Amino acid sequence: MQTLNTLDLQTTSLKIVNGQLWILDQQALPQRQEWLLADTVASLIEHIQALRVRGAPLIGLSASLLLALLAERGLSQALLEQALIALRESRPTAVNLMNNLARMQQALLQPNWVTAMAAEALRLVDEDRELCERIAQHGAALVKPGSNLLTHCNTGGLATAGIGTAIGVLLRAHQQGNLRQVWVDETRPLLQGGRLTAWELGELGIPYQLICDSMAASLMAHGQVDAIWVGADRIAANGDVANKIGTYSLAVLAHYHRIPFYVAAPHTTHDPDCPDGAAIPIEQRAASEVTGVSGGFGHCQWAPKDTAVYNPAFDVTPAALISGWVLDSGVITPEQVAAGFFQPHR
């Protein structure tokens, strides 16, 4: 079997070269495309927490690949177990990380654990690519000709191993000739929409216009939004969804304006052990992300020094506000969710 140390693997934002894991620095985009080495647990955790590598699926994949590489380098099972624990705690909200690490932990328990971990990590990458494609196919079928769609945060190849979740839907709809344009929320405070989604859509040739988050309501009121598409960091057993802060606001606005609100995510984002949105841990981030802005363009501080800040990275959208959960298995309706689709017994 080919080992990771001899394999050249690359996605939009991850690559393995000469047995080393590299990540595309998503804090530097779109001004600079820089690849950073992530060859230790400490360095990867730092990159994850600094959002240089981000997106629920991609975080899980980067952790899995690094563990497999460390196993091939001779790290003991005991140290790999410690690495699993440390990586699991690096970001609390995205459940894909926990799900991927659970599979890597099972591989670690196998008699041939080194080869088992390499095989499992590669399997996770291949699966994610396939899951993205299925989500895109199911979602694109919901897009009517001439649609103006609105999206939030970043859900494309930068956040996955494939074409993305919500952005994958937009791509396939565009290729099928049904997409007029995309409204891109800038996504405060870290501007993932303005920096990353705008860059990705431009690279894909998809027409878009960038808006401030607060402009979405006006667009909806004037009939300029036909549907909203977002991703997810965790789906609870009752269908509640945790996603980038600002998602809940869009869902409330969509409900008021009677606009479809779709969540596109792989089944690996579902957490059957989490009963509802109230049980989802919400990461709190640094005040500096709100009092100023940083990135490939440098840093600008605009708020007074020592300003008190509340900065949750995610919010929870209640299932009652969601028109459909577009998974790799198909489009799940509110009626199916109410009947217990996401409950543990399923």
Swiss-Prot record:
Substrate binds at R54, G55, A56, R91, Q192, N243, K244. Pfam families: IF-2B. It catalyses: 5-(methylsulfanyl)-alpha-D-ribose 1-phosphate = 5-(methylsulfanyl)-D-ribulose 1-phosphate. Its EC number is 5.3.1.23. One of its GO terms (biological process) is L-methionine salvage from methylthioadenosine. InterPro entries: IF-2B-related (IPR000649), IF-M1Pi (IPR005251), IF_2B-like_C (IPR042529), Initiation_fac_2B_a/b/d (IPR011559), M1Pi_N (IPR027363), NagB/RpiA_transferase-like (IPR037171). Belongs to the eIF-2B alpha/beta/delta subunits family. MtnA subfamily. This is Methylthioribose-1-phosphate isomerase. It comes from Yersinia pseudotuberculosis serotype IB (strain PB1/+). The lineage of its organism: Bacteria, Pseudomonadati, Pseudomonadota, Gammaproteobacteria, Enterobacterales.
